[in-house]
Amino acid sequence: QKERGLSSGFLASKGEKFRDEMMVQRKVTDEHAKVLSEAIKQQDSYLPATVKKSLAEATAFMAEVDARRSGISNQVLSPADTFAWFTRAIELNLAATSQVTPTLSQADMMRRFNVYVSFLSTKEQAGQERATLNAVLGADLPLDSTLLRRLSSILASQDTYLTNFRVMATPSEGEAL
């Protein structure tokens, strides 16, 4: 999420802003991806086939991250395309996470996992909001109608996921938010 936002701001500013932060975030993203990859390898024998399939799809999609980063650094990609690519990568990972729910046998665990997925989805919408606003601030221009529509849609989705979280969460889970 952070790399998406910084990349959007970098491209929108025509490379004038966010370069250093973006480069640092790429390293952080790579470190997190390595930890995730190791965890998946360690748990592979325990993962249901549906989860493995979703994780494989997300991993295959991320195989082009270096080419995307090069296009961003060289400013040959648009902020909109970059936003869409990172958003799809995140969606694929969230889909893999969501695949765990049907494999759970206890109703309370299913509910808790659905609460968790709603929280992650709310967080993702907040990340999209930040990336959109970062592009606006990076460009140093007024919010155009396309970005305004995107922002409105993001805020509506964020509100829906947050409502789902609050409906399913216990009082203590809700307070933790």
Predicted regions and their residues:
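Hydrophobic alpha-helical segments
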Residues: 1-177
